[in-house]
Amino acid sequence: GRQGFGYEVTSLKGHIAEILGLDKKHHMIIVGAGNIGRAVANYPSFGREGFQTVAIFDADPNKIGTDVAGLKVLAIDTMESFLDENPVDISVLALPVKSAQQVLNRLVEKGIKGIWNFAPTDLNYPDSVTVVNVHLSDSLQILSFKMLRAED
């Protein structure tokens, strides 16, 4: 910035978006159409930020074919063929612990490079894949700790 003038906000926002990789469109799939998967699919700002959900998969026959955020839930058995035909770089894992590692392995085999993991488990994956774990209980524990410190 220039002294007395500050920064040109539009230019600064553009540079920050570029640094964060938000100047590109990211196509993502969600694996798991339960509460967390539906919440992620319906989150309004992801699309504006360049994260476009292109498919949702589930293994539950009662969820397959239902509508979530304007997308029809697809059978998890069709995931690989979908990935063969559609460019996807991020997958959201919103599924039970028991199937998380197996699904991650299938995604890695199909070239997915980014995993946003909501399954409450740590996964094994190659260095070529970036995984961000979202453990909801960790966030609550941090909140509790910060509240306790604020009381001191």
Where are these regions (language model features)?
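Hydrophobic, well-ordered beta-alpha structural blocks that scaffold small-molecule cofactor pockets
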Residues: 1-94, 99-110, 126-152
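Short secondary-structure boundary segments
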Residues: 95, 118-120
